[in-house]
Amino acid sequence: IRISRKDIYEISRLGDNINSLLESISVKQISKVSSIRELIHEASILFSYSENNVKEIEEKLVERELIASTYLSKLNIMLLHCRISSINNIRFGYIRLKKILREEDKLIEGAIVELVAEGFKNVHTEIMSEINESLIEKEEFIRILKQKSESDVIDKVEEILVELYKRKI
């Protein structure tokens, strides 16, 4: 197999982005929210560093939700995601609700939060796609998100992304 300098660069970028995502993972437990809008607000706080940043993330998540609902009925979770200018990498987190949120016909146990840098690189999309496919295909991943510790979530995401990395080498 012939490997070019470009291939090495792409593989290195993938590795850097995987490491960055793994370092950013956050799992937060919340006692109660009364609406999807409130859940989105909590999600916007997860990776914020200022009030302006909270507003920007919240606006983008609401904007995305208005395009089409991000509720995954088979999993009883929201998949809150957006592109944002105030970060330069990807972020992944989970908000676990102690009390199920009931809104309209939805029963929501929690929300995955995925932020991708605006002007995102293909590698960001590839990483998030790998995680999202695992949500659908691997029941164990959902169980870990909903019930286990943050370090267990990090370990599972690492396992998923190491497989992606191995396939690319």
Predicted regions and their residues:
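Cytosolic covalent-transfer regions centered on His/Cys nucleophiles
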Residues: 1-169
